[in-house]
Structures are given as structure tokens and as C-alpha cells.
Amino acid sequence: MTRLRSLGTGTAFAIAAIALVVAIAGGTIAGTIARPTPTPSPTPEPTAAPTPEPDTAPLVFALPLVTGCATDDAVWVVSDGGGIGRFDGTTWRLADPTLHSLVGAVCESDVVLAIGPAGRVLTIDDRTKSIRADDLGIVDLFGVSILPDGVLVVGSEGAVLRQTSSGWQPYARGLDEDLFAVVGFSGTSAWTVGSNGVSFRLEQAGWRQFATGTTATLRALAATSPTEAVAAGDGGVLLRFDGRWRPLDSGVTSDLRAAARVGPVTYVAGDGGVLLAVRGNDIQRVDLATTCPLRGIFAKGTDLWIVGSSGTKAAVWRRQGDKLDRWGAC
């Protein structure tokens, strides 16, 4: 203490100032050393953009489309010598590009069953997105109908087969004519029509023939019960059953190929773009503004769907009341 005083007041202040500067500098250095090096930001990994699904709708409408049907979630169309198309309510796409010869199709819930020559039966599961092919023999299949407990198909030379949980079994004997259309109500009730104007009704005792008054080939059939049906065929032949078959004046000479019931109306379609609306004995022409052969029609709820094709040009129409939509060009 004595010695510090002897230095004088000015000297003491100078020493204190130097000490303060050193202390500040030391703190700055220490602070610089203590500050952690910033962690570099990770470089983001590049992500590939999803590849857009190709538009295969044009391929669908280049197929020889013949008919279709509707599952719970989609509309399906099949072709005779091409692939299979699917419409999800917004977009058409080629669901299966494999070449198939198919002439008829029915849908139930999420399953499509399509038929064709040489006993070919194609089962499409819309839920699992799978396709299974079965062959029922050399018989050509032309018509198919859903039953409450299975499926009924008809074909060449009077062939009738029924599918149940036990598999496929013959379901008629003594029928010789080619059968082109069938509508089934149960295992003991159905209608079928075919070549030479034949018609048969399935009853408890078996298949019973009903005279139609024509020898024209009958290719189309729609029915709501065993006592109410409409059949149509070559040369514009149109018949209505109300206890017996009665001829109706179709007003056309085109071959009529398909029929479907929507509400109280039976629609009949055929060559030359012909579409007829049959209400009882009243018949009206529906103009689709096409001359394309109409090969198949079916219902989805109250909507009528029409399928037409000529060579590699095809189209599908949807009729909702007075509104008409079309996809494709035919």
C-alpha cells in the first residue's frame, strides 16, 4: 500500500487504464474462441417428380367395341378383337391391352364377366384389379345374364350353361338353334331368343318354346318379368310379349342387335345408328346423330349407355334424361 501511493496518482490511473484495456481484450478473445461454429444446413436431396399416367383414352376408341356394363365404381367396355376400356366417371383408360374376342358382358358390384367364342369367359375383379380367363369348351357364347345366385350364358347350337358356387353346368337339353340373348330372373325363370325366330322361356318344368311369328334371327332381348319382354333382330323385327309374342312396327329395316330396360322404357339399338325407345306399343326414334353401328346398350341406374363401333372407330354415348354425352368418334 505504501509503495502504491509513492507512484503518484497519475501513474496509478495509467496502470488501471492499461489493466482495463487488457481485460476487455481478453474477454473479446475469449468470447470469440467460445462461440460455436455454425452447423451447415443439410443439402436437400432431389426428389423425382411423379411420372404422369399416359393418356390411353384414344386407344379405347380405336377398339372394335361391342358392349359394356357398369360396376359400382366404373363403366367397362369390351371389344371383339381388342382390349378392354374403363371409365371412372372422369377419365377413360385402357384397362387391359390384351387382345380378346368378347361379345357380351355383365357386371355386378365390383366384378365384370365377359364372354366370347370358344367358350371364353373372362372375370375381371375391379377391387383387386385382376383378370381370370376360363374356357367352357368349344361352344361359342353369345349372351349372358346375372342371376341372384350366379350367371346364365347361352350360345351356339342351343347351348345353355349356368354358373353357381359349384361351378359351370349345362342347363338345357334338346335345344338346337343358336341362342344370342338371355335374361334370367332365377334358376327356374328366364327368357332366351335366337336364330330362326326361336324363343324359349325357362319354367319349373324346363325350357318351353313360344312361337314368335317370325323366322328372322332374334339378337336382342330385354325383360322385366316372365310375362313382359321385348325382343328384336334382323331386318328391324321387333316383338313384344304380354302373354304371347306380338309384332311391333319398328319403322326400320336395320338389324337390331341390343336391348336394355331403363325405368318404363325399353331401348333397342342396331345398325345405322338406330336407337328406338319402346313404351308399350309406342315406339319413338332417338337421334344420336350417327350412322355408326350400335352394338351394345346397358343401364347404370337411370342412365342409358350405348356402345358403337365401325372398324377402328368407336364411340360411347351416355343418355341422362334429355342430356347426351359422347366419347370417341364413330
Regions found by a protein language model. Name each.
Residues M1-L7:
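Terminal targeting segments of Actinobacterial cell-envelope proteins
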Residues G8-C330:
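Residue-level hotspots at or immediately adjacent to binding/recognition sites across diverse folds
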